Amino acid sequence: MSLPYPFSALVGQDEMKRAILIAAVEPAIGGLLVLGDRGTGKSTAVRGLAALLPKMRAVQGCRYHCDPQASGGCDDCLHLKSGVRVRTEELPVPVVDLPLGASEDRVLGALDLERALVDGVKVFEPGLLAKAHRGFLYIDEVNLLEDHLVDLLIDVAASGENLIEREGLSLRHPARFVLIGSGNPEEGELRPQLQDRFGLSVEVRTPSAIADRVEVVRRRDAYERDPSEIGRA
């Protein structure tokens, strides 16, 4: 797996970088919306964030990486409320991409059809919302997201839980994450209901200084040749 472009190697865009760090330090701020021209490093900055985050402590083997010190976890971790000691592990804070073409099953999770057909058991296969729990859910071109997915995100972001009632399944699991969206306003408007879910917003522009543009190309070329080297530069 290739290394993401380093967050610190981005040229300029100080307001965007500061906003991303604020959202990372204080998740209660309510998410971040980054709007601006294409090619301004919006996606690169968000994906580079993962390397800056400290690891988190989670219940070992939990599919939703529940916090062993917090209540309100998944059904499998309800015993934590009784004070029972459990094994834990350190995991990277998840930074999960939600692509525009993602199906509802992929986002919410769905019945594992292979297990159902082969073993005759109903097993829930967690979706992107589960993977993003306690981390970040990133949507590039969020202004182009399909309406039905927007409605789902609004519900989950408000409740902090994902409720599944389909295909004979009825369950809920925690889904608390920092929502980060980016997009170009010229390509489509963002629904007001979703825009209200972002507590912080920032606009970015293509660098106008020739020196900055040259430096962007130089650093990108260095990254393409040796991703690990630019991270140490």
Where are the regions that the model predicts?
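Conserved ASCE/P-loop NTPase catalytic core
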Residues: 1-203, 208
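Conserved AAA+ ATPase "sensor/coupling" helix adjacent to the nucleotide-binding pocket
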Residues: 114, 215-230
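Short, charged, surface-exposed secondary-structure boundary motifs
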Residues: 174, 212-215
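Conserved small/polar residues in nucleotide/adenosyl-binding loops
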Residues: 233
